[in-house]
Amino acid sequence: MQMLTLAQQAKIASIELAQFGNVQKNHALLTIAEQLEQRSAEILAANAKDIEFAKNQGISTAIIDRLLLNESRLQGIANDVRNVAKLADPVGQVIDGGVLNSGLKIERQRVPLGVILTIYEARPNVTIDVASLCLKTGNAVILRGGKETKFTNAVLVEVVQQALETAGLPKLAVQAVTDPDRALLLELLKLDRYIDMVIPRGGAGLHQFCKENSTIPVIVGGIGVCHMFVEKSADQEKALELIANAKTQRPSTCNTLETLLVEKAIAGEFLPKLANRMKALDVTLHTDDLQKTEGIEPLDDARMRQEWLSLDLNVVVIDNLTKAVEHIREYGSQHSEAILTSDYQLARQFVAQVDAAAVYINASTRFTDGGEFGLGAEVAVSTQKLHARGPMGLEALTTYKWVCEGDYLVRK
C-alpha cells in the first residue's frame, strides 16, 4: 500500500473516531483485552518466530528481552488495556473557561490530536499500549514496528482491527506498516497534511533520524541515562536495596539506573558494600575507584553517555552535591534522576537544580512509567519540554480548542 493512501485512510478514520463517545470506545478496548487472552496461543507462537529470527540475527539479549512475550507479559498487556478502559476520557473535558466582559462565553476543551505515527523497534507491547491509548482519546494511529516484531505485530494488529469492527468503530483507525524499508518511513515523515504527531520509541539513532527528516512534530524521549546520587547522609543499607531495584529489576528498560554517583566522604565505606551486593546480582561495575577484580571493569567515559540496558553499572565518586549536579548535566538524558539522602534541604536543592522529566528523592528511577504514575499504559516517555514531558498518558494525546459562544455577539 502507498504511504499516502495509508495516511489518508488514517485521517478519515480519525474524523469518524472523534464522533464516538466513551462507551463505544471502552467496548472496543474491552474486546481487545478479551481477544488477547483468547488468542494467546496464536500470539505467542508468532512471537516465538520473532524470537528465533532475532537470535539468528545475533541481536543482543537486552533487545530480545524487550521483544519477548510470555503468558505473564501478555496477560499484563491485556490487563493494561482494561485499565485504560477504566480511566476517565479526557476528550471533551473543559480545562477552563468563563464569561468575558464582552459577554462572550468561552471554554477550553480537550480534543484528539488526530493521527499519530508511532515508530518503534523490538517492543510488541507498544503495539497494544499505543493502540489502546490512541483509541481511548479518539486518535487514529499508524504503527511502524521493527522487522524484529513482524510476526507478532501482524497478529496483534489483526486482533485490534477485529475488535474495532465488533464495536462498530472504524477498522482503519489502527493500521500498521510491516515493510521495514526505511524509504517508506521517510515518505510517512513528510505527510504532515495527514499525520499530526510522530512518537519514536527506540534508540538515540531512531530519534535523531526522525528529528532530522520529519516535517511533522516529533516527541523526543525514551533515552534513559539515569543517575542516582548517594549523598553522605543516606541510609547505606536501604540505599543498597534501592540501587539493586533500580539496576536489576528489568535492566533493558529506559528507566533503569545506569550511573551511580557516590559522595567522596562515604566512598571508602560504601563502595565495598556496593561491590559485594552487585556481585551477588551479577552486575558488572565500571569504575576507577575500586581495585580491579572479577566483576569490576575500568570506567569508559563514552559509555557514560549511553544506556547500558544490561547488568552493567557505572560508578563515579563525586566530591559533593554540586559536582553531582554538574555530572548529571554533562552526561544525563533528562529522563530520570535520583538522590538518596537524609538531608531534606539538600534533597530540595537537588530537585531544583537537576533538569529531568522525573526527579526522585529516596525512590527508584524504575517508577518513571505511565502505570506507576497512575496514567495507565504510556505511549512514550518524553524528555523534551514542549507539549508533554515524562510518561505520556491520555492527556498527552490530546490538544485543545477554544469554544466560544455568544448571542449574535459582535466585537466593539
From Swiss-Prot:
GO cellular component: cytoplasm
CDD domains per UniProt: ALDH_F18-19_ProA-GPR
Main location per the UniProt record: cytoplasm
Single GO MF descriptor: glutamate-5-semialdehyde dehydrogenase activity
The enzyme's E.C. designation: 1.2.1.41
Annotated compartments: Cytoplasm
Biochemical pathway: Amino-acid biosynthesis; L-proline biosynthesis; L-glutamate 5-semialdehyde from L-glutamate: step 2/2
Keyword Zinc-finger in record: no
BP GO annotations: L-proline biosynthetic process
Catalytic reactions on record: L-glutamate 5-semialdehyde + phosphate + NADP(+) = L-glutamyl 5-phosphate + NADPH + H(+)
Domain of life: Bacteria
Record's keyword annotation contains Manganese: no
UniProtKB keywords: Amino-acid biosynthesis, Cytoplasm, NADP, Oxidoreductase, Proline biosynthesis
Role played: Catalyzes the NADPH-dependent reduction of L-glutamate 5-phosphate into L-glutamate 5-semialdehyde and phosphate. The product spontaneously undergoes cyclization to form 1-pyrroline-5-carboxylate.
Family recorded in the similarity comment: Belongs to the gamma-glutamyl phosphate reductase family.
The protein's name in its UniProt record: Gamma-glutamyl phosphate reductase
Organism: Actinobacillus pleuropneumoniae serotype 5b (strain L20)
Gene name, Swiss-Prot/TrEMBL: proA
